[in-house]
Amino acid sequence: MIFYTVLVLMFLGSTLVFYSLSPYYGALGLVLVALSGCLLCSLLGFSFIALVLILIYVGGMLVVFVYSTAISAERYPSVSNFNEILVLSSLVISWGVLNFDPLINVEVNSWGFVTNSDLVGASNLYSSMGGYLLIGGYILLVALVVALVLTYGSDYSILKAL
Protein backbone atom coordinates (compact mmCIF):
# COMPACT_ATOMS: atom_id res chain seq x y z
CA MET A 1 0.00 0.00 0.00
CA ILE A 2 2.88 2.34 0.69
CA PHE A 3 4.05 2.01 -2.91
CA TYR A 4 0.59 3.01 -4.14
CA THR A 5 0.71 6.03 -1.87
CA VAL A 6 4.16 7.08 -3.05
CA LEU A 7 3.23 6.63 -6.71
CA VAL A 8 -0.01 8.60 -6.22
CA LEU A 9 2.00 11.41 -4.58
CA MET A 10 4.38 11.41 -7.55
CA PHE A 11 1.47 11.55 -9.96
CA LEU A 12 -0.30 14.34 -8.08
CA GLY A 13 2.92 16.35 -7.85
CA SER A 14 3.59 16.00 -11.56
CA THR A 15 0.05 17.07 -12.45
CA LEU A 16 0.46 20.07 -10.17
CA VAL A 17 3.65 21.00 -12.02
CA PHE A 18 1.93 20.52 -15.37
CA TYR A 19 -1.23 22.51 -14.61
CA SER A 20 0.17 25.35 -12.52
CA LEU A 21 0.50 28.78 -14.06
CA SER A 22 2.30 30.18 -11.04
CA PRO A 23 5.82 29.09 -10.13
CA TYR A 24 4.79 28.69 -6.49
CA TYR A 25 2.51 25.74 -7.17
CA GLY A 26 5.02 24.34 -9.62
CA ALA A 27 7.66 24.36 -6.90
CA LEU A 28 5.24 22.70 -4.51
CA GLY A 29 4.66 19.97 -7.09
CA LEU A 30 8.41 19.56 -7.64
CA VAL A 31 9.01 19.24 -3.91
CA LEU A 32 6.23 16.65 -3.71
CA VAL A 33 7.71 14.65 -6.60
CA ALA A 34 11.24 14.90 -5.17
CA LEU A 35 10.17 13.81 -1.70
CA SER A 36 8.14 10.89 -3.00
CA GLY A 37 10.97 9.86 -5.35
CA CYS A 38 13.47 9.89 -2.51
CA LEU A 39 11.01 7.96 -0.33
CA LEU A 40 10.69 5.38 -3.09
CA CYS A 41 14.48 5.11 -3.36
CA SER A 42 14.79 4.64 0.38
CA LEU A 43 12.08 1.96 0.35
CA LEU A 44 14.01 0.09 -2.33
CA GLY A 45 17.11 0.06 -0.14
CA PHE A 46 19.03 3.08 -1.41
CA SER A 47 18.52 5.30 1.62
CA PHE A 48 21.90 7.02 1.47
CA ILE A 49 21.43 7.98 -2.18
CA ALA A 50 17.92 9.20 -1.35
CA LEU A 51 19.32 11.35 1.45
CA VAL A 52 22.00 12.81 -0.82
CA LEU A 53 19.44 13.55 -3.54
CA ILE A 54 17.04 15.31 -1.19
CA LEU A 55 19.84 17.37 0.34
CA ILE A 56 21.05 18.41 -3.11
CA TYR A 57 17.52 19.29 -4.16
CA VAL A 58 16.60 21.24 -1.05
CA GLY A 59 20.00 22.86 -0.71
CA GLY A 60 20.51 23.76 -4.33
CA MET A 61 17.46 23.92 -6.50
CA LEU A 62 15.06 25.42 -3.99
CA VAL A 63 17.48 28.23 -3.21
CA VAL A 64 17.71 29.02 -6.92
CA PHE A 65 13.94 28.82 -7.21
CA VAL A 66 13.33 31.15 -4.26
CA TYR A 67 15.79 33.65 -5.69
CA SER A 68 14.27 33.59 -9.15
CA THR A 69 10.68 33.85 -7.91
CA ALA A 70 11.59 36.73 -5.64
CA ILE A 71 12.68 38.62 -8.73
CA SER A 72 9.64 37.79 -10.86
CA ALA A 73 6.74 37.01 -8.54
CA GLU A 74 3.06 37.17 -9.30
CA ARG A 75 0.68 38.98 -7.05
CA TYR A 76 -2.19 36.48 -7.35
CA PRO A 77 -0.96 32.96 -8.18
CA SER A 78 -3.44 30.57 -9.75
CA VAL A 79 -3.73 27.01 -10.98
CA SER A 80 -5.23 26.53 -14.44
CA ASN A 81 -7.96 23.95 -14.96
CA PHE A 82 -8.44 23.28 -11.26
CA ASN A 83 -11.54 21.20 -11.99
CA GLU A 84 -9.50 18.87 -14.21
CA ILE A 85 -6.97 18.43 -11.43
CA LEU A 86 -9.73 17.55 -8.96
CA VAL A 87 -11.30 15.01 -11.32
CA LEU A 88 -7.93 13.47 -12.19
CA SER A 89 -6.90 13.29 -8.53
CA SER A 90 -10.18 11.72 -7.49
CA LEU A 91 -9.88 9.13 -10.27
CA VAL A 92 -6.33 8.20 -9.26
CA ILE A 93 -7.18 8.01 -5.55
CA SER A 94 -10.31 5.95 -6.18
CA TRP A 95 -8.30 3.60 -8.43
CA GLY A 96 -5.77 3.13 -5.62
CA VAL A 97 -8.50 2.48 -3.06
CA LEU A 98 -10.30 -0.02 -5.30
CA ASN A 99 -7.10 -1.88 -6.16
CA PHE A 100 -5.94 -2.08 -2.55
CA ASP A 101 -6.20 -5.60 -1.22
CA PRO A 102 -5.48 -5.82 2.51
CA LEU A 103 -4.54 -9.49 2.14
CA ILE A 104 -1.57 -8.69 -0.10
CA ASN A 105 1.64 -8.81 1.87
CA VAL A 106 4.49 -7.88 -0.44
CA GLU A 107 7.98 -7.37 0.89
CA VAL A 108 10.39 -5.21 -1.07
CA ASN A 109 13.25 -7.52 -0.21
CA SER A 110 11.38 -10.54 -1.57
CA TRP A 111 12.37 -9.48 -5.08
CA GLY A 112 15.52 -11.19 -6.26
CA PHE A 113 17.38 -8.13 -7.51
CA VAL A 114 16.79 -5.63 -4.71
CA THR A 115 19.56 -5.46 -2.14
CA ASN A 116 20.41 -3.09 0.62
CA SER A 117 23.31 -1.01 -0.57
CA ASP A 118 23.69 1.42 2.32
CA LEU A 119 27.12 0.08 3.16
CA VAL A 120 28.51 0.83 -0.29
CA GLY A 121 26.38 3.90 -1.06
CA ALA A 122 29.02 6.58 -0.53
CA SER A 123 31.79 4.66 -2.23
CA ASN A 124 29.61 3.99 -5.28
CA LEU A 125 28.68 7.65 -5.43
CA TYR A 126 32.27 8.83 -5.58
CA SER A 127 34.10 5.97 -7.31
CA SER A 128 32.18 4.35 -10.13
CA MET A 129 29.47 7.02 -10.34
CA GLY A 130 31.79 10.03 -10.21
CA GLY A 131 31.01 10.95 -13.81
CA TYR A 132 27.30 11.01 -13.07
CA LEU A 133 27.97 13.17 -10.03
CA LEU A 134 29.85 15.67 -12.20
CA ILE A 135 27.06 15.63 -14.79
CA GLY A 136 24.52 16.30 -12.02
CA GLY A 137 26.58 19.25 -10.77
CA TYR A 138 26.87 20.61 -14.30
CA ILE A 139 23.10 20.32 -14.80
CA LEU A 140 22.51 22.23 -11.56
CA LEU A 141 24.89 24.97 -12.75
CA VAL A 142 23.12 25.20 -16.11
CA ALA A 143 19.74 25.39 -14.32
CA LEU A 144 21.05 28.25 -12.17
CA VAL A 145 22.31 30.18 -15.19
CA VAL A 146 19.07 29.59 -17.12
CA ALA A 147 16.94 30.75 -14.18
CA LEU A 148 19.01 33.89 -13.78
CA VAL A 149 18.99 34.67 -17.51
CA LEU A 150 15.23 34.16 -17.79
CA THR A 151 14.45 36.42 -14.85
CA TYR A 152 16.99 39.14 -15.63
CA GLY A 153 15.09 41.05 -18.30
CA SER A 154 11.56 40.72 -16.99
CA ASP A 155 9.56 43.92 -17.23
CA TYR A 156 7.04 43.06 -14.56
CA SER A 157 9.17 42.35 -11.56
CA ILE A 158 8.26 42.61 -7.91
CA LEU A 159 11.51 44.41 -7.12
CA LYS A 160 10.78 47.19 -9.61
CA ALA A 161 7.82 48.25 -7.49
CA LEU A 162 10.12 48.77 -4.54
Swiss-Prot record:
The keyword Translocase applies. InterPro entries: ComplexI_Subunit6, NADH_UbQ/plastoQ_OxRdtase_su6, Nuo/plastoQ_OxRdtase_6_NuoJ. It catalyses: a ubiquinone + NADH + 5 H(+)(in) = a ubiquinol + NAD(+) + 4 H(+)(out). GO terms for cellular component: mitochondrial membrane. GO terms for molecular function: NADH dehydrogenase (ubiquinone) activity. Its main location: mitochondrion. The chain crosses the membrane at residues 1-21, 46-66, 84-104, 130-150. Keywords: Electron transport, Membrane, Mitochondrion, NAD, Respiratory chain, Translocase, Transmembrane, Transmembrane helix, Transport, Ubiquinone. Its EC number is 7.1.1.2. Pfam families: Oxidored_q3. It is found in: Mitochondrion membrane. It is a multi-pass membrane protein. It comes from the Eukaryota. Core subunit of the mitochondrial membrane respiratory chain NADH dehydrogenase (Complex I) that is believed to belong to the minimal assembly required for catalysis. Complex I functions in the transfer of electrons from NADH to the respiratory chain. The immediate electron acceptor for the enzyme is believed to be ubiquinone. Belongs to the complex I subunit 6 family. This is NADH-ubiquinone oxidoreductase chain 6.
